[in-house]
């Protein structure tokens, strides 16, 4: 009887863990659920705004510690980017910010706004702002982050696997933001994912699958209502600072031409 009870408990636990994996797997979108480039253009949207985000150099920093905070859910770092000398990253909540506060981190992110940080010496919010702002993009600095890791991105166009390309990262644990940026950067440069006046494609999404089969995806194109384009509304997907294992993450891109 005791053995039977043990078997039943094991079976229940297996079902629970199976269901946990199932719940954590975001279902793939249907074609009609994806944002359409033609809808965005018809609403007077300019895809060049998105193109600029993923072709401009990202913010990068290695082994840095935040110098201060403005709000409890952000961290400000002494990183030079273009003509600025500070970068503020916003995180989903205070707990997440505290995770990285006063610790040595690596940063990789896409800026969404400039002249957005109040100078430390100016408590008056009417004074001139500086710096640039981004979401997430933090990983703990590690001496193991030395060698490049290769990640293959499989691309399916109109339901046919068409090509694959490789991106690299020197991090064992890497943010989704870094991987997403590098994939979109390559697709924009090589396959015209984003052009000033549109795209070579009508819709699409990028999908990430972790070792435990947890999966999630991002729509590659803005909603038709995002006119005029507001960068923070497009990039706030990175605010959760999602970090994955670069050795096991699977990346796929699904594109449609009509």
Swiss-Prot record:
GO molecular function: toxin activity
Main localization, broad class: secreted
Extent of the signal sequence: 1-25
Keywords: Disulfide bond, Enterotoxin, Secreted, Signal, Superantigen, Toxin, Virulence
One Gene Ontology term, aspect cellular component: extracellular region
Keyword hit for Disulfide bond: yes
Disulfide bonds: 116-133
Compartments it resides in: Secreted
Stored InterPro entries: Enterotoxin, Staph/Strept_toxin_CS, Staph_tox_OB, SuperAg_toxin_C, Superantigen_bac, Toxin_b-grasp_Staph/Strep, Toxin_bac
Entry's family note: Belongs to the staphylococcal/streptococcal toxin family.
Stated role: Staphylococcal enterotoxins cause the intoxication staphylococcal food poisoning syndrome. The illness is characterized by high fever, hypotension, diarrhea, shock, and in some cases death.
Protein name: Enterotoxin type G
Taxonomic source organism: Staphylococcus aureus
């Amino acid at each position: 009887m005791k053995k039977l009870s043990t078997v039943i408990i094991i079976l229940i636990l297996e079902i629970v863990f199976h269901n946990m994996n199932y719940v954590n797997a975001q279902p793939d979108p249907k074609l009609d659920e994806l944002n359409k480039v033609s809808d965005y253009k018809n609403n007077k949207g300019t895809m060049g705004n998105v193109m600029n985000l993923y072709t401009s150099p990202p913010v990068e920093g290695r082994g840095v510690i935040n110098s201060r905070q403005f709000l409890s859910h952000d961290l400000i770092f002494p990183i030079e980017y273009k003509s600025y000398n500070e970068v503020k990253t916003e995180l989903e909540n205070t707990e997440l910010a505290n995770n990285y506060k006063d610790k040595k981190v690596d940063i990789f992110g896409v800026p969404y706004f400039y002249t957005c940080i109040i100078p430390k010496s100016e408590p008056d919010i009417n004074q001139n702002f500086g710096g640039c702002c981004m979401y997430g993009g933090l990983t703990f600095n590690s001496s193991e982050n030395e060698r490049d890791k290769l990640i293959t991105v499989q691309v399916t166009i109109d339901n046919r696997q068409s090509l694959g390309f490789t991106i690299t990262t020197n991090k064992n644990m890497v943010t989704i933001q870094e991987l997403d940026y590098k994939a979109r950067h390559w697709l924009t440069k090589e396959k015209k994912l984003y052009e000033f006046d549109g795209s070579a494609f009508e819709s699409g999404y990028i999908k990430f699958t972790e070792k435990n089969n947890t999966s999630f995806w991002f729509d590659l194109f803005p909603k038709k209502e995002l006119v005029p384009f507001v960068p923070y509304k497009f990039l706030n997907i990175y605010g959760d600072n999602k970090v994955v294992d670069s050795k096991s993450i699977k990346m796929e891109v699904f594109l449609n031409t009509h």
